[in-house]
Amino acid sequence: MIGNWNYGTGRRKTSVARVFIKKGTGKIVVNGKPVDEFFARETGRMVVRQPLALTGHLESFDIKVNVIGGGETGQAGAVRHGITRALIDYDATLKPALSQAGFVTRDAREVERKKVGLRKARRRKQFSKR
């Protein structure tokens, strides 16, 4: 805990989010912008609010997020992971519910590298028998 802020780091794909939460009115600020402005798609905003909705703290915390790297989906997932860890830092009794929903586990899926001689990671050149 830093002062009266609780901290959590979240990661997803190539995105990293640093999340600070404190008791407040429910404001979520991502990279200096309100969450509704930062995430253009509704799915991104929904993903960010999932841990708060699950624990019933949707209007209880002010959240400040700094997120770098990746795209919109990766950043939303990183913010969700960070908020989850910050909530656990605030109150460890929330961990079982968050674990049950699968928010505590870091999604380890990464982009597979392109291999030499192939078009993409697994896509080969079309085979011609004749």
From Swiss-Prot:
PROSITE patterns: RIBOSOMAL_S9. One of its GO terms (molecular function) is RNA binding. The keyword Ribosomal protein applies. Pfam families: Ribosomal_S9. Keywords: Ribonucleoprotein, Ribosomal protein. One of its GO terms (biological process) is translation. Belongs to the universal ribosomal protein uS9 family. Gene3D superfamilies: 3.30.230.10. This is Small ribosomal subunit protein uS9. The lineage of its organism: Bacteria, Pseudomonadati, Pseudomonadota, Betaproteobacteria, Burkholderiales. GO terms for cellular component: cytosolic small ribosomal subunit.
